[in-house]
Amino acid sequence: MASWPPLELQSSNQSQLFPQNATACDNAPEAWDLLHRVLPTFIISICSFGLLGNLFVLLVFLLPRRRLNVAEIYLANLAASDLVFVLGLPFWAENIWNQFNWPFGALLCRGINGVIKANLFISIFLVVAISQDRYCLLVHPMASRRRQRRRQARVTCVLIWVVGGLLSIPTFLLRSIQAVPDLNITACILLLPHEAWHFARIVELNILAFLLPLAAIVFFNYHILASLRGREEVSRTRCGGRKDSKTTALILTLVVAFLVCWAPYHFFAFLEFLFQVQAIRSCFWEDFIDLGLQLANFLAFTNSSLNPVIYVFVGRLFRTKVWELYKQCTPKSLAPISSSHRKEIFQLFWRN
């Protein structure tokens, strides 16, 4: 194929990745020239926003001198995962700018791609865990104990990070740099040792990392929404009902944003698998999949910088935590206005 997506670059051997007639399907040179010029700038912008935004989220969650609740434990881990992910984006921006000529050596080829692959699993598993926690809290509230949920959340997050790391081991082992004399580049590619690995990879990528988690997310959130509709009047009078509803609204927004950002990537990854096993063939499909994967990767990248924006504009309780942190870090002499006046200003400024 004409190019390779940053999240998963693969080849069984060089002849498959760069066939003799590879240029026969080069039907969109203008599109590729535009992509090589424009996409790196957007990726660096995403990296900058994601770095600052996720650092801000982690500071808001971790600086206050109190224990995190269950939702905050999951959201802090999601922010940490996004932060690690965006740290690898400048390398891929430079890679695309160089027309996929990897300049950073074999170690970073494996390390950066391994981290990106681990983040793919960690993020989706955290979204499942967050949805499952909301499901237990709202659909089965009598069986949900706060202390037990907090301990379970910590253990779950540790397991998710470990599993994500284990699932990225093939990427660490099979990634390598390879010279491509016809294109005069040295590419960072995933060297699959056997044709069967293509099938194993798509099972891992599309089923384990998307379809199964998607089924769980849809199940949990369907019952969450049904529970919220059925208990709307009760939740208004129940202690903490408004707080639970606000937190659930934030989490549902995060879930929708995650699926919108990542679904196109998995769709094009599946099309790429069909192309590799020759289920679909033609220059149209090759160019469509190549360009589509690049744009789908970009959309997936945006999710890591979008989450902090969602926290600020959807998460009212998060904004309250920001205000509390500001009061904690600001000397009283610098904030002489009355608390009621300050609260009024705060509510007017952040009103949705």
Curated annotation (Swiss-Prot):
Domain of life the protein comes from? Eukaryota
Give the residue numbers of the S-palmitoyl cysteine lipid attachment: C329
Gene3D superfamilies membership: Rhodopsin 7-helix transmembrane proteins
Q: Name one GO molecular function term.
A: bradykinin receptor activity
Spell out the InterPro entries in the cross-references.
Answer: Brdyknn_1_rcpt, Brdyknn_rcpt, CCR1-9-like, GPCR_Rhodpsn, GPCR_Rhodpsn_7TM
- Which cysteines are disulphide-bonded? C109-C188
Membrane-spanning intervals of the chain: 42-62, 73-93, 111-131, 154-174, 207-227, 251-271, 295-315
Extracellular-side positions: 1-41, 94-110, 175-206, 272-294
Quote the subcellular location field of this record. Cell membrane
The family annotation for this protein states: Belongs to the G-protein coupled receptor 1 family. Bradykinin receptor subfamily. BDKRB1 sub-subfamily.
Name the record gives this protein? B1 bradykinin receptor
Give the source species.
Chlorocebus pygerythrus
Provide the gene name from the record: BDKRB1
